[in-house]
UniProtKB/Swiss-Prot annotation:
Pfam families: RuvX. Its EC number is 3.1.-.-. GO terms for biological process: rRNA 5'-end processing. This is Putative pre-16S rRNA nuclease. Belongs to the YqgF nuclease family.
Length: 153
């Protein structure tokens, strides 16, 4: 994979109850786990994410996809794709996907958060996904190239 051009991005570990978040500086040097969002509704998520994007001058979004061992979509990865597309279109920001297979286990081990239920693990996962994206890509895709969501939120 080709290393993407560094830019200020926001990374998501999407879940039905929480969304883990992480961001990086415009040069892609420092990755920071941010406070997770405890989900209530899509509109509330959007309001919080939009505010964060303005505050951090975000130029793109990274969404983790929980693919199976063979790299195929799962029910949850389809939810993640649709959520990411909807957020990217609402914010008019480019988007990239990162395979997050086993990332919760990796983050739990790395940060000793195996039994966390507060959302710290979700944001630690988002940070690992962002680090992976900075190393491996892929490039951010413009909103105009994204398919329409298939599932309503």
């Amino acid at each position: 994979m080709v290393r993407p051009k560094p830019t200020s991005v926001l990374s998501f570990d999407y879940g039905h109850k929480r969304i883990g978040l992480a961001g990086c500086d415009p040069l892609g040097i420092t990755v920071t786990a941010l406070s997770p969002i405890h989900r209530i509704s899509f509109q509330k998520d959007l309001t919080l994410i939009k505010s964060l994007c303005i505050e951090r001058e975000i130029k793109g979004l990274i969404v983790g996809l929980p693919l199976d061992e063979s790299g195929q979509n799962t029910v949850q990865s389809i939810h993640c794709q649709n959520y990411g597309i909807k957020i990217a279109k609402e914010l008019d920001l480019p988007l990239a996907w990162v395979n997050e297979h086993s990332s919760s286990w990796d983050a739990g081990q790395k940060y000793n958060l195996q039994n966390d239920r507060t959302g710290k693990l979700d944001s630690a996962v988002a940070a690992l996904l962002l680090e992976q994206w900075l190393r491996e890509g892929p490039e951010l895709q413009p909103v105009s190239k994204l398919d329409s969501p298939r599932i309503k939120f």
